[in-house]
């Protein structure tokens, strides 16, 4: 098995085209933990994970990207959030029976692809495109064409290696403010499209690039680790409780004696008792530990 859960950037200087290659296994597995998703939903989350990793690698600033599918199908929501440090988390919501072998359109139904870019400093940007493509890669290419106006191709694969979940993908994109020739970009895209799933999952990045582009000059940069990391915390939950009306909190406390909050992403469980609520109302941060 190749070195998994790593992202590699590479560059074709003579063509003004950049590329990325990512493979993930453990990160995908951790996203699926604590959830009993049908197989097609697991696959889509793997594809979203790959896509989000590739997209966050295009950021030139500290921040995060959220890639979300929304629709009226049996999987009415699936989302992956990742930052420029390649820290990922994700979740899906299933509201109906998922047919075995369901494709993207069957899962999501009539829906949208929503991409939200949130810099640590600066304005948040959100782009929305209809799910007109048959695959997630096609929908993302449509997004780039409409919003960024940068020729972009994505190649996303999911499967198993030695009994372990594996997902991977590649991205090609014309560098901003560069005038790459269309024929050159299509030539590189045609080469990239020949990647075999087994090669992507099992070969080191430098060997994958050599097999695809051995007649081209390619600069491969140092890899970046991809990992699962949830940003939930007791403090964030307390902040959410501060936004609720006192009457609503009092009603829950009167009925249950405490407030339970669960993180959909990682399964962490937070409990707030009457003393905690009093501290929250006094703008103090409750110090009780989280309960897993």
Swiss-Prot record:
CDD domains on file? Hsp33
Pfam families xref list: HSP33 (PF01430)
Q: Which cysteines are joined by disulfide bonds?
A: 230-232, 263-266
Please list the GO terms describing molecular function: protein folding chaperone; unfolded protein binding
| InterPro entries associated with the record | Heat_shock_Hsp33 (IPR000397), Heat_shock_Hsp33_C (IPR016154), Heat_shock_Hsp33_N (IPR016153), Hsp33_helix_hairpin_bin_dom_sf (IPR023212)
Keyword field: Chaperone, Cytoplasm, Disulfide bond, Redox-active center, Zinc
GO cellular component, alphabetical, reads:
cytoplasm
Q: Which GO terms describe its biological process?
A: protein refolding
Q: Read off the SUPFAM superfamilies from this record.
A: Hsp33 domain (SSF64397), HSP33 redox switch-like (SSF118352)
The keyword Cytoplasm appears for this protein: yes
Q: What is its main location?
A: cytoplasm
Q: Where in the cell is it found?
A: Cytoplasm
Describe PTMs of this protein.
Under oxidizing conditions two disulfide bonds are formed involving the reactive cysteines. Under reducing conditions zinc is bound to the reactive cysteines and the protein is inactive.
The family this protein is said to belong to: Belongs to the HSP33 family.
HAMAP family, A to Z: HslO (MF_00117)
The protein's job, in short, is: Redox regulated molecular chaperone. Protects both thermally unfolding and oxidatively damaged proteins from irreversible aggregation. Plays an important role in the bacterial defense system toward oxidative stress.
Instruction: Spell out the protein name for this chain.
Output: 33 kDa chaperonin
- Organism of provenance: Enterobacter sp. (strain 638)
